[in-house]
Amino acid sequence: MSVENVDNLNEPIEDINNVDIEELPDKKIGTKEVQEANEILRKYKEGKKNLESRVISCEEWWKSNHWSQFKSQSNNINDPKPTSSWLFNSVINKHADMMDNFPEPNVLPREKSDEAVAEALSEILPVVLENNDFEHTYNSVGWDKLKTGTGIYGVFFNTRLQKGLGDIDIKQLDMLNIFWEPGITDIQASRNLFIVELVDIDLLKTRYEELADKISNTGIDISKYEYDDTVDTSNKTMVVDWYYKVNSGIGDVLHYVKYVGDVVLYASENEEEYTEKGYYDHGKYPVVFDVMFEEKGTPAGFGYIDIMKDPQEYIDKLDQAILKNALVLAKPRYFIHDNCGINEEEFANIDNDFVHVASSLEDTHVQQIVGVPIPAQYLEVKQLKVDELKETSGNRDFSQGTTTAGVTAASAIAALQEAGSKTSRDMNKGSYRAYKTIL
């Protein structure tokens, strides 16, 4: 569970407000177990370091901070640093395809006796999704999927919703805030799962008054994006949601612990109600990964930015060379002999009708620096890189409603658009599979 606000904590309030968990005589989860969990969390975090670096880099590419991400930097601070938006344009078109095909639940009976249940679910599920503002969540997860290769849903039961009655809570989870066992491909195969979030210390102390004197800054750090704003986290601490599976002999039982540092805030194994059956009856981690392009050995994938950033880099570098050349040609410069006697200030000011000289002028005293235009073949190289980016991302012109010269028939244009949208259809099917798992 993402703990971005303490009002969203999903453990039963009455179970923890009046009982100090540390004093329970038969508790299975205490300080020792949480300290061991912290060590596992650190190992998981270390194993995910390269992935997190790539995710942060993709976010910078998305924000058009291209030049800070280039493999080789320009050393001349006066060089222009253009950032064309071919990569950005491709991503937003893919996202538009996702939102144009936003799914709706359609529950069908497996057999005749299921018809009544299927009909009831067909009426209930849309209401649950509407209460969760699921379209907004789908939108946000879609951006993550396209940019970084992985969008993550969290599907929880939040006891504080519906005025304390509780309800399903579907959230977007940040890749930097979730940790799993390195080397696994299916997230459900991980031995443990950690979801972390920074929360204000004073809010936690108010929420858990009986543990207020034990709550402090944990010292656990997580990777952060390069924010434009200054983000102060000095008065926040890391709240960890730890999920783990126990083999009961007939299947996996899922348990859940919420803790800060080595202080247990809630543990399902310490509750008689959940000891045998686990925190969720289905026994699965309450997360769903929507992956763009799969990789071996990880439940995460890579996205369109990873594919497009190389051609985008060379497009921008070629743009830099073209613009630099254009600036040199557009503003003539001159070689001037030290002793030619020309008033340089008057010469540089184009508003002066007259320029004073101290002696007679000769051709060798002042010479214009002649620039050489970039040959046409290098301009063509840039266009080839643009075409490469379009082709590799499946964002050809006709997918945006434009066509190349010679294609004018409506049926031909429609056929090109249909053929060109197959990568988007494949992408949407992946999102539909994640949607089905959520439901």
Please place each PLM-identified region on the residue numbering:
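Extended, helix-rich architectural segments
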Residues: 1-276, 373, 377, 381-384
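Long amphipathic alpha-helical segments
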Residues: 81-125, 129, 157, 266-300, ...
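Short, solvent-exposed secondary-structure capping/transition elements
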Residues: 137, 162-166, 327, 397-402
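Glycine-rich, acidic/polar active-site loops that bind/position phosphate-bearing ligands
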Residues: 306, 319, 323
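Core catalytic machinery and nucleic-acid-binding channels of phosphodiester-processing enzymes
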Residues: 307, 311
